[in-house]
């Protein structure tokens, strides 16, 4: 890398999952709008053609006169080729295909278990983790061999176990996980400020919060805007909208978009515990007993959120594949929209181009009390020149921490089971999940069925009869 006049040149970014039609395009967008950094993005994907398509799309974007950030995109045929010489590594992969995810999400429905996402916890999240962890073992070993000093940014779910695996295999790795769920809660606090106090259009970055918890089950126990206590403002907001829910856009709401909610799960958790649940309702609902919010589709509708079906994801993939073709041929112009992501800002800060405080997922080295040392937790952290320091965030209320700890220990059990290829250990995590409220006999039948549906990613496993 070269530093000149407040800019950094010749940076090398390895992108694992470089054929992505979502996260990769977001990265291209944010790099294109940032003139202070430039270099090469090496795209690796098990689908080389997809990575090559993104090479064409990215290089066409870089040549445009309206683009400030100039990057060379290069598709790589092997993981090793992409990692050699990398200063940063970005991991954004789909572990398996949507066929496996279809089993993760929908096989449990035969037993009355409903999941709104199915990629983090619940039966789907656990089985997804069992096939993801071996992939991250390989990635960690490759990083250790080819670019041990690189900063590693993970976007893949299950976030906690992906990051945890990287550190288990390569303890000296400089890795962290990024998730935008907390950003949505900052935006909700901004809307509460407008609704209750009449203060309009406050950017989420000006909403100062203390974050603590685990990914997708993150909490805020202190929130301020200048001298205004937003915990008090939020309480009034929750009391006002608890029954009706809060809908910010009538044309894009929980009834016509399964990714959107009316925030009623979030509001209910606040009234129960007095701290703000800082993730989308679809994720939060999966961390607590299933009969709270996910008893059945009717209950889900009462709480005003949606069950995201894998059939929808498959249709969406078809649309993105068609868009990829249009972008590749130039039939469609690549629009530089706001992505809402912070990866490029984090890279800049690590390069010494200004400090940044934001939420990330890292091993617990004392930043949260009451959670085991080494478990991956989500808190704020300070990014500065080649340094990342988690912010001391205190302790969750005991009644919240008991919910979090159940998931932490389950995640640790899942990791051990995946590394040992231990059916019984994995099943013990499966039946301990709050969504699995069926009999042991039915739970074992379901578990075996789900493992059978993902067995091509479970090398060395013996699925018991």
Swiss-Prot record:
Binds 1 Mn(2+) ion per subunit. The keyword Hydrolase applies. It comes from Thermoanaerobacterium saccharolyticum (strain DSM 8691 / JW/SL-YS485). NAD(+) binds at residues 11-78. This is Alpha-galacturonidase. One of its GO terms (biological process) is carbohydrate metabolic process. The lineage of its organism: Bacteria, Bacillati, Bacillota, Clostridia, Thermoanaerobacterales. Keywords: Carbohydrate metabolism, Glycosidase, Hydrolase, Manganese, Metal-binding, NAD. Pfam families: Glyco_hydro_4, Glyco_hydro_4C. The keyword Manganese applies.
């Amino acid at each position: 890398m070269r530093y000149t006049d407040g800019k950094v040149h010749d940076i090398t970014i390895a992108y694992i999952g470089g054929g992505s039609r979502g996260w990769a395009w977001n990265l291209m967008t944010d790099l294109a709008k940032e003139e202070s950094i430039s270099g090469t993005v090496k795209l690796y994907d098990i689908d080389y053609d997809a990575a090559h398509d993104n090479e064409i799309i990215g290089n066409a974007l870089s040549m445009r006169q309206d683009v400030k950030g100039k990057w060379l995109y290069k598709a790589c045929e092997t993981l090793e080729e992409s990692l050699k010489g990398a200063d940063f590594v970005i991991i954004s992969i789909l572990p398996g295909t949507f066929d496996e995810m279809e089993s993760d999400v929908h096989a449990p429905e035969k037993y009355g278990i409903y999941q709104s996402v199915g990629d983090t916890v619940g039966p789907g999240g656990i089985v997804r983790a069992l096939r993801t962890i071996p992939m991250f073992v390989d990635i960690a070993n490759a990083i250790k061999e080819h670019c041990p000093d690189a900063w590693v940014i993970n976007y893949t779910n299950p976030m906690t176990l992906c990051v945890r695996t990287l550190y288990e295999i390569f303890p000296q790795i400089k890795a962290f996980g990024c998730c935008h769920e907390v950003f949505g809660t900052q935006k909700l606090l901004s809307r509460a400020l407008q609704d209750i106090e009449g203060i309009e259009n406050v950017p989420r970055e000006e909403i100062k919060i203390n974050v603590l918890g685990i990914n997708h089950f993150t909490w805020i126990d202190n929130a301020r805007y200048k001298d205004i206590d937003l915990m008090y403002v939020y309480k009034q907001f929750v009391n006002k909208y608890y029954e009706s829910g809060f809908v910010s856009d009538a044309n894009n709401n929980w009834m016509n978009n399964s990714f959107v909610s009316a925030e009623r799960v979030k509001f209910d958790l606040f009234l129960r515990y007095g701290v703000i649940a800082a993730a989308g309702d679809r994720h939060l609902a999966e961390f607590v007993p299933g009969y709270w919010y996910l008893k059945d589709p009717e209950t889900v509708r009462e709480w005003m959120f949606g069950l995201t079906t894998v059939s929808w994801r498959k249709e969406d993939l078809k649309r993105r594949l068609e868009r990829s073709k249009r972008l590749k041929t130039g039939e469609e112009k690549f629009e530089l929209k706001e992505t809402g992501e912070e990866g490029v800002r984090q890279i800049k800060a690590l390069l010494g181009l200004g400090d940044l405080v934001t939420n990330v997922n890292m091993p617990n080295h004392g930043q949260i009390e009451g959670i085991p040392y080494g478990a991956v937790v989500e808190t704020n952290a300070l990014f500065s020149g080649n340094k990342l320091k988690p912010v001391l965030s205190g302790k969750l209320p005991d009644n919240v921490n008991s919910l979090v700890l159940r998931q932490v220990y389950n995640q640790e059990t899942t990791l051990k089971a995946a590394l040992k290829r231990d059916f019984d250990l994995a099943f013990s995590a499966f039946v301990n999940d709050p969504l699995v409220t069926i009999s042991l006999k039915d739970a074992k039948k379901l578990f075996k069925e789900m493992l059978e549906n993902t067995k091509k990613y479970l090398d060395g496993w013996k699925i018991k009869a």
